[in-house]
Amino acid sequence: IDSAAQTVVVRNLDTGHEFTDQWDRMILTTGGASARPALAGLQLPGIFTLRTVEDAVAIRQWIDEHHPERGVIVGGGYIGLELAEALAAHHMHITLLEATGQVLPTLDAEMAAHIQAELTAQGVDVRLDCAVEAFAGSERVREVLAGGQHIAADIVIVSVGVKPSVGLARAAGIALGPTGAVAVDDHQRTNITGIWAAGDVAEAQHLVMGRPAY
């Protein structure tokens, strides 16, 4: 993106052909990507994140090919809980690891306690205040090291949030805010005239706190 010339260089990913196009106004919606913590063993086969259709297909293929009996979900947010339900439907023993003191940390503690009770009633092993330290295995993931414990695992899904995809914005000179996402005003305008940003790439204005949020 050349904001001064108001041009953008585009590459056709099928053919490799590149061309330059012009714009009068631009809306940047490059989204975000699953956060991947810098932990040893994260690259082992059998460890997944879930953000795209391709991610879901890869998870399903692993289940069909390896028939895992023990699943570990890292993160007790909305996606983590949905995954717990989905994997339990495949008759796995599910362990859910959450680094904070409750599942769904954005909820009131009283509400979260009811949800945790239901998870436990459905056979999910919920472990709170349990931060992951590393993943272990040789040819594939075999266990998760968390809270000083060794938890056996045939499949691991890491669901610890989203990070904004700001590489293109940064290269174009678009300012990032304190959260690391693109800074915008209450009309989604960036610091560059004629460029707006929205979605997972951009901050939002917290109506109660009166400050940027992500």
Residue ranges: model-predicted function:
Residues 32-34, 54, 78, 102, ...:
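Residue-level detector of alpha-helix initiation sites
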Residues 1-10, 14, 21, 89-186:
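A Rossmann-like FAD-binding core segment of flavoenzymes
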Residues 7-10, 15-70:
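Glycine/serine-rich phosphate-binding loop and adjoining beta1-alpha1 elements at the start
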Residues 31, 75-80, 148, 199:
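Conserved phosphate-binding and hydrolysis motifs of nucleotide-dependent enzymes
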Residues 18, 36-37, 81-82, 153, ...:
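Glycine/Thr-rich phosphate-binding loops of Rossmann-like dinucleotide-binding domains
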Residues 43-67, 139-143, 150-214:
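FAD-site-proximal beta/loop scaffold in flavoenzymes
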Residues 27, 48, 72, 95-97, ...:
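Hydrophobic/aromatic beta-strand patches that form the interior of the parallel beta-sheet core
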